[in-house]
Amino acid sequence: MSSHTSAGSIYKQQDLKGMKVYPEHYVKILLLLGEKLVAQFDRFRVDYIMCGGTLLGAVRPPHKFIPGDYDLDFELLCTPGNRKRFFELVKHVRANPVGCGINCVLHLPTVVKFVPEMARELARRFGLNNPSIPNPTADVFITEPRRGGGHKIVGCQWPKWYYKAGEIFPLQTLAFSGLTWCAPNTPEKIFRRYYGKTWRIPEHYAWPTSSARTQ
């Protein structure tokens, strides 16, 4: 049996066990949010990589959004001038949310959360701001150099999520639900460190009890 079929079978088994699956139209909104955010990354020359469940979905067959996930995860790289360029992006988005199609909420020093920018009536039609379903968000985690090389997330509550020297560069691009985004050179190493040897087997984690609200 192929790994693609195996992963699909496991997802189906989890669905039968009551795993919450992110609604299809929420996934479409989320992917469009990610596409718009990455366009801003490119515009402002921001160096980034996928991380967390997004990177896991890109690496593990079928290379797409994990059904039980509920957001997108990116990390800001510690390259020269990158943090300055990123916050220029943040300033631009906050000043032009309608034109960018996205907005953001600062949870510094750790993360900036990007959300879709849409009229309240449109959000209502899409069923957003539902307390039982996390709204689509794209989290960009701020990083800092790590002693001995590599980087870690500022104020990170996940001590095993870090990169050693040589695990990030050279960057690669990976397909994720039909999109192509930047990824670290050796993602398997961080997965083994963070999730353990069974990282290829899908596992469901509970959704948060609250979500960022869209406008």
Where is each model-derived feature located?
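A structural signal for short, well-ordered beta-strand segments
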Residues: G53, F74, A138-V140
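Tryptophan-centric aromatic hotspots in well-structured domains and transmembrane helices
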Residues: Y48-I49, G53-T54, I66-G68, F169, ...
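Juxtamembrane luminal stem/stalk of type II transmembrane Golgi/ER carbohydrate-processing enzymes
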Residues: M1-V21
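A solvent-exposed, acidic/Ser-Thr-rich amphipathic alpha-helical stretch
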Residues: F86
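Conserved catalytic core of two-metal-ion nucleotidyltransferases
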Residues: M19-D42, V90-P184, E188-R193, P202-Q215
